[in-house]
Structure formats: C-alpha cells, structure tokens
Amino acid sequence: MTNRAAACVCGLPTASCSREPARVSLCHCLACQRRTGSTYGIAAFFPRESVVVAGDAKAYTRSSDSGYAVTFYFCPNCGSTVYWSPDRKPDLVAVAMGAFGDPAFSAPTQAVFTEHRHKWVRSGPAG
C-alpha cells in the first residue's frame, strides 16, 4: 500500500493518501493560473475514501471553467492550496502535486484547457 503525505508550506493542513492517484492532470485554465500564480496547475486525483485530511484549512468555493463548483482548501496561515473537491467528480479529491514535495511523483497523464496554454510552455501530456 502506498502512503503519500501532502502539506502546505507551514505544515498546518495535510492530506494523507493511501493509494496511487487515479490520474494526474495538468490544467491550463485561467482560474488555475490565477490560483497558483503560475502558468498551470497540476493535481493528483485520488479516490475520496483513500484521502485523510487533518489540520485547519479555509474553504473557498467557486464555479470552475467546466461550469461545476469546486471547493478549494488552503492554509489560513501561509495561504498554500493543499487539496480541493470538484463537484463534477464527487468520488475524487484533488491534491496539489507540489504539496507532496516529491520530485519522483508520477508525471501528468493528461492536460486540460490547453487552449489557454502559454505558447512558451512545452505541450506535455495529450496536449
């Protein structure tokens, strides 16, 4: 059994994942660009029953580019996003790939909203 631990910069909220991710997705949507302050976001999606969250987290819900609501959980202390729950996929929890702090983590298997990809970013998976 795989155990992975994700945390924010200061370690307050955590997400422990007991299985391999169902998928790892690189998202170029404008909302992810704004949320991360980067040109894309990368999420590892895990079956909900395999994720245990702990510590204080502040929630923020917004409509996604797909039209479904998504609730983000971030640290009230350092502001880092650790995980989120997409209404479109209620059986999954998304965890920010960078929150694992593991350079050997699985590479993304798909790219979405590639029409918003910055031209200087290499295409990556399926895009």
Regions inferred by a protein language model and the residue ranges of each:
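A short Gly-Trp-Pro
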Residues: 1-127
